[in-house]
Each structure stands twice: as structure tokens, then as C-alpha cells.
């Protein structure tokens, strides 16, 4: 079952979303300390308005346990969504510059992850299909995401769902494929 995340899902969702974020999680939190990173990301998650707010996260639950999570938002909202994150960085004396991972006209899948014990059951596909539904409900014309160039299997998975590779992006010193799926 796919539901809007709740603030009480913070610990599990941050653990899952960090699987997808990899090193970018530390960059976003403004720290290289793992414990502090989790603390800061959990604070962002329970907040109302930022990239990884619970309001932008959808969870897949099985037997009432969160086993998958997906963070999505509209690229045109990034200035508003980044305000709290940049304020946190400033408080930590960090010169954080957030990358525009998506374009202003894209409904963006920022991160998606499924608990390792539940992979291979189609949960990621269901979450992505849900992103298409949300995008359509909000009158967005396309859904986007990025895939690390070193992950050809992941790229093939997204292409099998109808995403088209439209180019490359360099974000936080990593190279990514930029993928788009038009919403009809």
C-alpha cells in the first residue's frame, strides 16, 4: 500500500532514502558525521517545507511496516524547498551550494529506495507509477530523475518504465544520466 509519509516515519524513511542519496546525504546535511547527518536529515524530514519533507515523501507499506520510500517534488519549487536546508548549512558555517538536479518544469523523483529484504517484488515500480499519478493530478507534463553513470542496470530499469535518457548532468562531482518520462 502506498501512502503519504508521516513524521513518525522519519527514522525508517531517512534510512531508506540515504540508500539512494549515497554521499549526497552528507552534502545535504552539511556534515560528514554519520550520526549528525541522520539527525539533520530527520529534522528536515519532519519539517513542512524542504526537499525531503515528509510532505514530499511517499511510502510503501507491507504489514504496516515501511519497506520502500520515494521523495518527489516539482523543480519549480526548489527555491522555496531549499531555504531551510541552506539556513542549516549557514548555521554549520558551511558554504553549501545546492545543485539543481532537475529543471523547473519537471516533477522530480529525488530519491527512491526499497528495503533490501523486499527487493524484486515490484515495489519500486509501484512507487514510480504513483509518481506518474501524482504528476498528472498536479498537471505536470513530465517526470524526471537522474541515474549514476556507473549503474547501467538501474538505467535499464528506468528505461523499461518508459524514461528516456536526454543527456548528462554533473552533480556533486558525480556524473549522471538525466531521464525524462512524458506524462500524457
Identify the function of each model-found stretch.
Residues 1-15, 23-28:
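A short beta-loop-alpha structural element at the N-terminal edge
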Residues 22-45, 56, 90-91:
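Conserved GNAT-fold acetyl-CoA-binding loop/helix
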Residues 141-155, 160-162, 168-184:
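C-terminal "cap" of GNAT-fold acetyltransferases
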Residues 106-107, 119, 128, 135-148:
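Conserved GNAT acetyl-CoA-binding A-motif
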Residues 74-107, 111:
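Conserved acyl-donor/pantetheine-binding loop and adjacent beta-alpha core of acyl/acetyltransferases
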Residues 46-59, 76-80, 108:
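A short helix-loop-beta-strand connector motif used in the catalytic cores of GNAT acetyltransferases and
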Residues 114, 120-133, 137, 156-160:
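Conserved acetyl-CoA-binding loop-helix of GNAT-fold acetyltransferases
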Residues 59, 65-74, 108, 113:
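Conserved beta-strand in the GNAT
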Amino acid at each position: 500500500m502506498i501512502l503519504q509519509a508521516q513524521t513518525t516515519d522519519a527514522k525508517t524513511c531517512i534510512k531508506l532514502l540515504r540508500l539512494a542519496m549515497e554521499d549526497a546525504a552528507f552534502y545535504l546535511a552539511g556534515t560528514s558525521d554519520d550520526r549528525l547527518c541522520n539527525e539533520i536529515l530527520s529534522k528536515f524530514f519532519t519539517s513542512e517545507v524542504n526537499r525531503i519533507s515528509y510532505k514530499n515523501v511517499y511510502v510503501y507499506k507491507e504489514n504496516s511496516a515501511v519497506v520502500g520510500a520515494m521523495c518527489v517534488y516539482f523543480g519549480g519549487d526548489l527555491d522555496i524547498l531549499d531555504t531551510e536546508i541552506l539556513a542549516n548549512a549557514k548555521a554549520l558555517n558551511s558554504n553549501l551550494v545546492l545543485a539543481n538536479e532537475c529543471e523547473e518544469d519537471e516533477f522530480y523523483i529525488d530519491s527512491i529506495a526499497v528495503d533490501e529484504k523486499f527487493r524484486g517484488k515490484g515495489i519500486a515500480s509501484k512507487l514510480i507509477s504513483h509518481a506518474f499519478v501524482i504528476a498528472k493530478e498536479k498537471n505536470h507534463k513530465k517526470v524526471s530523475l537522474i541515474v549514476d553513470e556507473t549503474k547501467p542496470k538501474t538505467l535499464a530499469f528506468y528505461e523499461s518504465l518508459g524514461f528516456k535518457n536526454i543527456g548528462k548532468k554533473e552533480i556533486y562531482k558525480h556524473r549522471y544520466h538525466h531521464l525524462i518520462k512524458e506524462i500524457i
